[in-house]
Amino acid sequence: MKVDIFESSGASRVHSIPFYLQRISAGFPSPAQGYEKQELNLHEYCVRHPSATYFLRVSGSSMEDGRIHDGDVLVVDRSLTASHGSIVVACIHNEFTVKRLLLRPRPCLMPMNKDFPVYYIDPDNESVEIWGVVTHSLIEHPVCLR
């Protein structure tokens, strides 16, 4: 998997943008609901530990069923401890990959696409390093301009 790594930049270029507290309907809208506005700073929302956070751009389709697609940007926090079920960035034989970490019944890195094999972790003869826990994914949706 090819990855592009971006470090978390300082807050000097970060701007707060309007954030409406009312949840938006994905069904039929209610015109009677009012909308309360606050400010949302995406850097503060996505980056809990700036010195331990980096961004990766996904390349490949092994995590599509986990809603992580080719081209998405992942927010990865190295200060968090991965646990059973965490989405992690791992380094295997000097190659980076993003997978779901399963610790039981047998430790493995599980792709979220049935077309890809499970990578079983054998602690006796193999070095797998967890580089961080994925906390957010940023998806760019196509925009149709007229």
Curated annotation (Swiss-Prot):
It is an enzyme of class 3 (hydrolase). The record marks 26-27 as: Cleavage. Its EC number is 3.4.21.-. The active site is at residues 62, 99. The keyword Repeat does not apply. One of its GO terms (biological process) is SOS response. Keywords: Autocatalytic cleavage, DNA damage, DNA repair, Hydrolase, Plasmid, Protease, Serine protease, SOS mutagenesis, SOS response. GO terms for molecular function: DNA binding; serine-type peptidase activity. The keyword Nucleotide-binding does not apply. It comes from the Bacteria. The mucAB operon is the plasmid-borne analog of the E.coli umuDC operon. Involved in UV protection and mutation. NCBIfam families: PRK10276.1. This is Protein MucA. It comes from Salmonella typhimurium.
